[in-house]
Amino acid sequence: MANKIKAEKGLSTEEKFKEAARIVFTKKGYAATKTRDIAEQAGLNLALLNYYFRSKERLFEIVMIEKVQQLFAFMAPVLNNPGTSLYEKIDLITPSYIDMLLKNPDLPMFVLSEIKSNPERFGKMIQANNILQSSFMRQLAEEKKDVNPIQLFLNFLGMMVFPFIVKPVLQTIVPMNEDAYVQLLEERKVLIPQWMRMMLE
């Protein structure tokens, strides 16, 4: 077990549990994580964790929602920046998005589950309307006038997210350890902007 959350950080009890959950969920994945693991990581009592969050599912939901909001908090200024070109936006978003997903491998499945169970809440959470009206979407429309910009945006997003969704299947089909998988994604940081340029020609 990694070092416990230090008391001197000055975090509240709730924040200690959330930080511990981020560490353990990332390390072990949702299915293999037990609430006891999180309590031990936080250096706090299991009963206290149950008092604050009631269940592993609830804690996971809170932590992942914060991660989604952090992601789109980063993306929004990039998508809406009129001072950068379309290709500069693509070059900025691609590596940052992939790096974030590498640090939070359970996030794509959480997002899919959240979209299925509560699409309206998820749309509000990521401010979907702001994305559709962003400078990025306008630039896509201007660059490729004969294609709906939503099609291009879905391609862009899918090329980054899909490898994380199919990882378990991929590793059963292709002999691939974790290092090889990460290397595959490092290559996609370069390839995805190239593929987007080809689509936009």
Model region roles, listed by residue range:
Residues 1-12, 19:
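N-terminal intrinsically disordered/low-complexity leader segments
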Residues 2, 134-149, 159-201:
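C-terminal peripheral helix-coil segments that are non-catalytic and often amphipathic
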Residues 16, 20, 24-58, 62:
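Helix-turn-helix
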Residues 63-91, 130-140:
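Amphipathic alpha-helical linker/stalk segments
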Residues 72-75, 105-109, 123, 160, ...:
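Short amphipathic alpha-helical interaction/hinge segments
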Residues 77-103, 107, 144-153:
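Hydrophobic alpha-helical connector segments
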Residues 94-97, 111-114, 156, 160, ...:
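Short alpha-helical scaffolding segments that buttress acidic/His motifs in well-ordered protein cores
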Residues 99-138, 177-185:
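Short secondary-structure transition hinges
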